[in-house]
């Protein structure tokens, strides 16, 4: 598994855990970093994972607003936690990071949905992130 793929998976797991525990993503990230330094069985939390989590945290409210606006007939709190976490991560990387092609960001999010969520989730994630990709220039300006 490529390093960035692993980093995205870890970032997703941190967002998921924070949502499940009702804690901030920064707090859960700090727990993961601390644990990786004290437990040899835990892999280190890489720089790209930290960049994704911290970046999401910076735009969390805006990202949730976008999901609510464009996820037709879905309330964010009724959405499966897995899907919500994948969408949050994908939206941040897609809209605010420029280092990865949009198609790769969307594909990686779809792969996470295939691995961790329901049979319907990959197409839902793909559709919503594709919509964000199409609107990306406007979404960045509306910050």
Curated annotation (Swiss-Prot):
A Gene Ontology cellular-component term: cytosol
Xref: Gene3D superfamilies: NusB-like
Pfam families in the cross-refs: NusB
Name used for this protein in its record: Transcription antitermination protein NusB
Family assignment from sequence similarity: Belongs to the NusB family.
Entry-linked SUPFAM superfamilies: NusB-like (SSF48013)
Keywords noted in UniProt: RNA-binding, Transcription, Transcription antitermination, Transcription regulation
GO molecular function, one term: RNA binding
GO biological process assignments: DNA-templated transcription termination; transcription antitermination
Gene it is expressed from: nusB
Signal sequence annotation: none
Job description of the protein: Involved in transcription antitermination. Required for transcription of ribosomal RNA (rRNA) genes. Binds specifically to the boxA antiterminator sequence of the ribosomal RNA (rrn) operons.
